[in-house]
Amino acid sequence: MAAKDSKLAGTGKVTALGTALRPLNSEYGKVAPGWGTTILMSVFIGLFAVFIVILLEIYNKSLILDNVGVNWLSSTGL
């Protein structure tokens, strides 16, 4: 396996973009200890679910908003 890796090490082209993105790849395979950002991610998923439910209620007209028309037809009559 080491011989194969040494062959691949010399191949490829060094680019400015690759050099700039190299620090992002240095964390590959590492796992944050504990729960990490799971709680924050769960909060955002919950907020997104509430947003989707509100949109569905507006679309189904089960959430009535005063003075907000939901007419999908063009008002110009084209």
Swiss-Prot record:
Q: Name one GO biological process term.
A: photosynthesis
* Membrane-crossing residue ranges in chain numbering: 39-59
What is the superkingdom listed in this entry's lineage? Eukaryota
UniProt membrane topology term? Single-pass membrane protein
**One term under GO cellular component:** chloroplast thylakoid membrane
Kindly list the cysteine pairs connected by disulfide bridges. Answer: none
**Where is it located?**
Plastid, Chloroplast thylakoid membrane
Q: Which Pfam families match?
A: PsbH
Show the InterPro entries listed in the entry.
PSII_PsbH, PSII_PsbH_sf
The record describes the protein's role as:
One of the components of the core complex of photosystem II (PSII), required for its stability and/or assembly. PSII is a light-driven water:plastoquinone oxidoreductase that uses light energy to abstract electrons from H(2)O, generating O(2) and a proton gradient subsequently used for ATP formation. It consists of a core antenna complex that captures photons, and an electron transfer chain that converts photonic excitation into a charge separation.
The record's subunit annotation is: PSII is composed of 1 copy each of membrane proteins PsbA, PsbB, PsbC, PsbD, PsbE, PsbF, PsbH, PsbI, PsbJ, PsbK, PsbL, PsbM, PsbT, PsbX, PsbY, PsbZ, Psb30/Ycf12, at least 3 peripheral proteins of the oxygen-evolving complex and a large number of cofactors. It forms dimeric complexes.
Q: What is this protein called?
A: Photosystem II reaction center protein H
The source organism is Ostreococcus tauri
**Gene name of the record:** psbH
